[in-house]
Amino acid sequence: KRLTTDTYHVQNRGGKGIKGMELNKDDIIDQFISMSTHDHLLVFTDKGKVYRIKGYNVPEFSRTSKGIPAINLISMEKTENIRALVPYSKDHDSKFLFFVTKQGIIKRTTFDEYENINKNGKIAIKLNEDDELAFVRSTDGNAEIIIAGSNGKAVRFQENTVRPLGRTARGVKGFNVDGGYVIGLATNLEGEYILTITENGFGKKSALADYRMTRRGARGVKTVNVTEKSGKLVCMRAVRGDEDCMIMTAGGIVIRISLNQVSVYSRSAQGVKVINVKDDIVSSVAILEPEEDSEVVDISHNEVLDEGVFEETPDDEDIIENDEEDVTDSDSEE
């Protein structure tokens, strides 16, 4: 569904949030994006397909409305699930689309290969049988890529070290998930801080500069200390640090906070409680431009996990270099 961004107002971190939308049984809120109704929207699914619609073709509903099934707007299969929404306008500056799968396969493809997509869709990336598309980002061709896993590790490398492939190619190994799965894809174009949030509601900002540059395919460095108390890492985003953050739970609760309220900690720390989930878990996080004239209140009594308890391991021990196995298919069209 579509709704105006001023529907949700800033609250203090650690709050309980408000009801964002009614949900069907076994459904969760996955993504919020900010765009103009006149922009095109590329819709990528877990099966590796891409569809295109206009922003104004998505009906506008109230805050608590369920919206309509995406299958009513695009010709996706009933077994497909939306994994990424990429808005773009005629004057966009993006040159490439960067893909990462749940198992850590990556691909970089020129943006113009996806500009002539209709509502019936086309193949965006080939996938292994046990894999699915996880994230897609638009880039300028010279970005730094950051990929994070559910185990709290992250890898950072230069985008231009990955050669461009055709629309239907499979890709190359980008991140060693080490028994977990990919939970985040970000670029340095989005900000100089890394925001991490765990499923039990702990969050923090860390300086992007704290993440050592490695090569694609590495296991990476610790980006958050994952424990039973914190739960798995569910969000990793690059931010400026002054945006608003919309946090959504599996139970349909939404809270909007200012990232000015989230302190900067070392990359191996766990952070502070940013949402009280109780018997719920965080399902997804969206970043929005800050509300004008929103009041930021310092709350010192919120639970903080002392970063001193979670010392960083030395970089030489923290990083395991990649193997060079590629899994590239031919670029022939399907």
Predicted region positions:
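C-terminal interaction appendages of subunits in large macromolecular complexes
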Residues: 1-334
